[in-house]
Amino acid sequence: MKTGAIVFILRSLLSITYLPLVLMTLDIPEELQKAVGRVIVNATGCSVTCGLGYKEETECEVGPDGVRRNCTFQRLECVTNWICGMLHFTIVHGKTFELNCLSSDILEKGQEAFRFTWRLARGIISTNDELFRPFRANSPFIGFKPAYEYNAGTYRCDVQLLKNLKFVKRLYFGLRVLPPKLVNLNFQQSLTEDQKLIDKGWEVNLDNGSKPHLPVWQRKVTSALGIGIVAGVVGGVLVSVAVFKALGGTDGSGGRTRL
């Protein structure tokens, strides 16, 4: 046993001794040392978080010396997430309304490069795709002129690239249509008297129920008008007194002359 162990140790030492000689023979060929490759040296993120977007990349030739040469800039399409969630809308029966599936990136490329498909889950707000049925529309818009209660539901818009039918966007629209007599969505009519005064520019203290007072500029105008009225009344009284005294003095002197 001891003899076998000694032999194993001696062979290991001999292998270690010849290892540098083996490594010396593994030289990199001169052709590979001069090789040049194209590498992406800079890249931006996608311009949108969902749907079709764009990213920018800079690609350069890099050699063994690490110097960048012949760099090119390119703008590429990208899709981080093609499902874009839901938008909610509440309208009143009889109103005109439109759903729009377009985005700035689609408009930049041109809507003719895309295919638009709509599906509808009538009468319910949901993203469960099993509830949707085909809806006859192949444009990026759905218009309601006017909208009726049976138009309520969830509309799903799918956008595909025509060149390869790749899905690049899915957007849900939750549409609620209320009866005209159920609720009044008129902002002005829903305000209290104090809120209407505030909306017109009055200053109202809603905490203690104090009477509303005019804004600063209106208070200045009111004060100026008040001062003018008071000054006019006082001036009129003084003029009346002066005239009365003048008339009284003339009558007295005439009487004394007659005497």
UniProtKB/Swiss-Prot annotation:
The keyword Electron transport does not apply. GO terms for biological process: sperm-egg recognition. It is a single-pass type I membrane protein. Disruption phenotype: Mutants develop normally into adult males and females. male mutants are sterile, whereas females show normal fertility. It comes from the Eukaryota. Residues 80-173 form the Ig-like domain. GO terms for molecular function: protein-macromolecule adaptor activity. One of its GO terms (cellular component) is plasma membrane. Expressed in mid-round spermatids. The chain crosses the membrane at residues 224-244. Keywords: Cell membrane, Disulfide bond, Glycoprotein, Immunoglobulin domain, Membrane, Signal, Transmembrane, Transmembrane helix. Glycans are attached at N42, N70, N208. Residues 26-223 are extracellular. It is found in: Cell membrane. InterPro entries: TMEM81 (IPR039293). Residues 1-25 form the signal peptide. Residues 245-259 are cytoplasmic. Its main location: membrane. Disulfide bonds join C101-C157. The keyword Membrane applies. Forms a complex with IZUMO1 and SPACA6 on spermatocyte cell membrane required for fertilization. Essential fertilization factor required for male fertility. Part of a conserved trimeric sperm complex with the essential fertilization factors IZUMO1 and SPACA6 which bridges sperm and oocyte membranes during fertilization by binding to IZUMO1R/JUNO on the oocyte. This is Transmembrane protein 81. It comes from Mus musculus (Mouse). The lineage of its organism: Eukaryota, Metazoa, Chordata, Craniata, Vertebrata. The gene is Tmem81.
